[in-house]
Curated annotation (Swiss-Prot):
Lineage: superkingdom: Bacteria
Coiled coil: none
Family, similarity comment: Belongs to the membrane fusion protein (MFP) (TC 8.A.1) family.
Keyword Transport: yes
UniProt-listed InterPro entries: CusB_D23, Multidrug-R_MdtA, RND_pump_MFP
Basic and acidic residues: bias regions: 394-403
Name of the protein this chain belongs to: Multidrug resistance protein MdtA
Spans annotated as Disordered: 387-415
């Protein structure tokens, strides 16, 4: 009896398990059927998409004059730098410049107390006047002695002595004249003037201080910035190109760009080339000169130098984005009239971040693919589309209304 009841319990449990399994399967099949259809439909759509021409962007190779530049790093240096010092000793009485001021050669910069130099000049002038009178008297005596000598009233010895006295007085007079000139020069040097055109820096000494000609710091440093120079370096491999460009007889144009190489500061000309290569760095120094009338360049400023050495005429130019690299070298995808692509191996020339010169393998007017290149195969047909601008991206899709001013305002308020 107990075994019969036990068997009946197992049968009932089995029926329940089978029923639950059937229910779960039915629900799973009901939910999977729509998604399976969707996946199947998506697969068919994907197949249709795969057979459509790949969208690409293209550009036309153009013919133009392309400049060739050599680039290097450099530092702006003053054309001349002078430490203005006093040539005489004395007390600094006045300063006649403002720090940072542009001055001309000969402008008064400072004054030393001139009192002692005026006194010395007066003494020298007095001595000169005295000795000039002495010389005049000696010459008159000599004239009388010469007259008396004709009648033998004076001896030859006395006549020679008087002649020597005149010569001595003449020598003394010349020494006095030199002393006067020296005293005048000392007085002139008490007025310190600018030796060159340039910009004065910060003053190194204040009014009232005792200064001397032996002071090494000087009164102020004067730098000539109109014109101003740029000293930059180029690799030794560029020397031949520079020398060849110089032999053409035309001045080489040099541009100074800022530290980030994004803004051109000024344009000048190559002034000179160093006579030896730096063996440590393998570079050579060059110097360019700039008028710098707008003061765009400043001494010790770091800049990027670009020197134009040649211009390639009628060069075939394409966007850099079109140039690709493969196992056989550089190549581009060229479009024919039917918008089918073919791979062309090319030889490149001058290149920058935006464009590249093609020296072989392409002609002006050829169309090259610039975007969508990764989907291309030889002979594939493509659909050339225009590059989407920011304004186009902001336009609403067809059937979608543009937001009104009130909607934009409400969105702005929520944000």
């Amino acid at each position: 009896m107990k075994s019969t009841v036990k068997k009946r319990g197992w049968v009932i449990a089995g029926i329940v398990v089978v029923a639950l399994a059937a229910l779960l399967y039915w629900r799973y099949a009901a939910t999977e059927a729509p998604s399976g259809k969707a996946q199947h439909a998506g697969g068919r759509a994907a197949m249709r998409m795969g057979s459509a021409p790949a969208p690409v962007q293209a550009a036309t190779a153009r013919s133009e004059a392309v400049p060739r530049y050599l680039t290097g790093l450099g530092t702006i240096t003053a054309a001349n730098t002078v430490t203005v010092r006093s040539r005489v000793d004395g007390q600094l009485m006045a300063i006649h410049f403002k720090e940072g001021q542009q001055v001309k050669a000969g402008d008064l910069l400072a004054e030393i107390d001139p009192s002692q130099f005026k006194v010395a000049l007066a003494q020298a002038q007095g001595q000169l006047a005295k000795d000039r009178a002495t010389l005049a008297n000696a010459r008159r005596d000599l004239a009388r002695y010469q007259q008396l000598g004709k009648t033998n009233l004076v001896s030859r010895q006395e006549l020679d002595a008087q002649q020597a006295l005149v010569s001595e007085s003449e020598g003394t007079l010349k020494a006095d004249e030199a002393a006067v000139a020296s005293a005048q020069l000392q007085l002139d040097w008490s007025r310190i003037t600018a030796p060159i055109d340039g910009r004065v820096g910060l003053k190194q000494v204040d009014i009232g201080n005792q200064i001397s000609s032996g002071d090494t710091t000087g009164i102020v440093v004067l730098t000539q910035t109109h014109p101003i120079d740029l000293v930059f370096t180029l690799p030794e491999s560029d020397i031949a190109a520079v020398m060849q460009a110089q032999k053409a007889g035309k001045p080489l144009t040099v541009e100074a760009w800022d530290r980030t190489n994004s803004t051109k500061l000024s344009t000048g000309e190559l002034l000179s080339l160093d006579n030896q290569i730096d063996a440590t760095t393998g570079t050579i120094k060059l110097k360019a000169r700039f008028a710098n009338e707008d003061d765009a360049l400043f001494p010790n400023q770091f800049v990027n130098a670009r020197m134009l050495i040649d211009t390639q005429q009628n060069a075939v130019v394409i966007p850099t984005a079109a140039l690709q690299m493969g196992n056989e070298g550089h190549f581009v995808w060229v479009l024919n009239d039917d918008n089918k692509v073919s791979k062309h191996t090319v030889t490149t020339g001058i290149q920058n971040s935006e464009s590249v010169v093609i020296t072989a393998g392409l002609s002006a007017g050829d169309r090259v693919v610039t975007d969508g290149i990764d989907r291309l195969t030889e002979g594939a047909k493509v659909d050339v589309v225009e590059a989407q601008t920011a304004a186009d991206a902001a336009k609403p899709e067809r059937g979608e209304r543009a937001p009104t001013d009130s909607a934009r305002a409400a969105k702005g308020a929520r944000s």
